[in-house]
Amino acid sequence: MEMEKNQHISSLDIPVIDLSNPDEELVASAVVKASQEWGIFQVVNHGIPTELILRLLQVGMEFFELPETEKEAVAKPEDSLDIEGYRTKYQKDLEGRNAWVDHLFHRIWPPSRVNHKFWPKNPPEYIEVNEEYASHIKKLSEKIMEWLSEGLGLRHEALKEGLGGETIEYLMKINYYPPCPDPELVVGAPDHTDVNGITLLVANEALGLQAFKDNQWIDAEYTTSGIIVIIGDQFLRMSNGKYKSVEHRAKMDKEKTRISWPVFVESSLDQVFGPLPELITGDENVPKFKPYVYKDYKFRKLKKLLLD
């Protein structure tokens, strides 16, 4: 099975959905279909200005090009149990290959959870650009959540409310993958599914994201102005299995620096989530997953403990 899983093809393309199509019903249907069959898709003409995305990429790259001492000004404290801050992460994937990536985590919404201590002061535009991007990405994510809720036959607020409503958190992560002379020995990010509800990601021109479908790894082709949307575990479980939490990974590039900006849309740690009650309607629609407090689910998944 492992040999099969390591097979790689590029003949399939992840779905690309044009949000400027005036037929919103058609757009919503495409989003639902992609979430059911793939768990990953790209949206284009999504309303977030291309100039803003390019500025986001620029200030992020400038931060990671700073001397290490400057980056350490926003480092994750050694004794912190939270995730926010800058750090260099080393780990091995299931095949024993080294995985390394420098990264920076900080929340961008809601305001009550934003800690500017972990937002770089250099480059000077960093805070302004990220605040502007946060307002746009929140609006886009809420629209996608509405379509996904309606795709379940529910009120358009259902998934947002199930995730926590106004307490939903938006966690920005910047992944910085330096060039690697031998990508076969190193991976950028090991195979995984996201624990959260939905992830919205932009990246620079160095491709490297792969998704697992039909027992094959597929290169995710994308443009720097497009947004990659990834369905996570919370929406898999809240939809009672109707939406797919896609397994994905990041590979290294021999010559180019790859950098990506996922925003994880997730519950607060104390939020209870599970199959939405409206979907559990009788013997044919029994719950497929146990409900969890989000922090307990994250802990059990991290420790590879039994979940259901």
Swiss-Prot record:
Phenotype upon loss of function: No visible phenotype under normal growth conditions.
Domain of life: Eukaryota
Expressed in which tissues: Widely expressed at low levels.
Single GO MF annotation: flavonol synthase activity
Comment on bound cofactor: Binds 1 Fe(2+) ion per subunit.
Residues of the Fe2OG dioxygenase domain: 167-267
Keywords linked to the UniProt accession: Iron, Metal-binding, Oxidoreductase
GO biological process: flavonoid biosynthetic process; response to light stimulus
Binding site for 2-oxoglutarate: 175-177, 258-260
A Pfam family assignment: DIOX_N
Reactions it catalyzes: a (2R,3R)-dihydroflavonol + 2-oxoglutarate + O2 = a flavonol + succinate + CO2 + H2O
InterPro entries found in the cross-reference section: DIOX_N, IPNS-like_FE2OG_OXY, IPNS-like_sf, Oxoglu/Fe-dep_dioxygenase_dom, Plant_2OG-oxidoreductases
Entry binding sites for Fe cation: 192, 194, 248
Enzyme class: oxidoreductase
Cofactor(s), by name: Fe(2+)
Known EC number: 1.14.20.6
Oxidoreductase listed as a keyword: yes
Pathway: Secondary metabolite biosynthesis; flavonoid biosynthesis
Annotated function: Catalyzes the formation of flavonols from dihydroflavonols. Possesses low activity in vitro towards dihydrokaempferol and dihydroquercetin producing kaempferol and quercitin, respectively.
Family per similarity comment: Belongs to the iron/ascorbate-dependent oxidoreductase family.
Name recorded for this polypeptide: Flavonol synthase 3
Source organism of this protein record: Arabidopsis thaliana (Mouse-ear cress)
